[in-house]
Amino acid sequence: IDLFNNNSKRISVSGVQIKYSLVADDGILRLTKEGEQGEFILKPVPNNLRNKEFCPANEHLTMQIAAQVYGIPTAPNGLWFFQDGTPAYFVRRFDLSEKGKLQKEDFASLAGLTRKNGGSDYKYDNLAYEEFARIIDKYSSVPQVDKLRFFELILFNFVYSNGDAHLKNFSLLEEKKGRFRLSPAYDLLNTHLH
């Protein structure tokens, strides 16, 4: 765990929680090297939450319930335990293919919101769900299907108390030849516990 903490500035990916970029090397996950594209994101136990030791299991369980019980497409994920038994959550990046990185745009970007024009809490901007639907109508190659998937995801977030369902936790993902679809769900967890 010290290796991760000592390298957090070099390999951390965006977001509030500390995250690390990993790659599979002969079947073993390791930190990415400078300039190397990571295949996985690892999220260790956060420092700033109530019941923080349960956060990795909470996210993994919530993602599994979404996928296995409700049929919501989710990013492949799992739990990883350090040698001292400390858990971490990891997720396979879904914006990579054999041909390289796929374009992924979160809803904050698609709505034109940034820290500069929306302030420090821009991703929590109170856009109505109707505005999310307009974004899907404008950019999705199959808007009716994606709006239904989005509605199901909103209901899931409500039922499972995911209070972190902000603009940057919904994305459209490039498929083929510039066609975009609602991405698999990610960052699903019961925030009421934390």
Where are these regions (language model features)?
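Conserved kinase catalytic-core segment
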Residues: F54-Y70, D125-L193
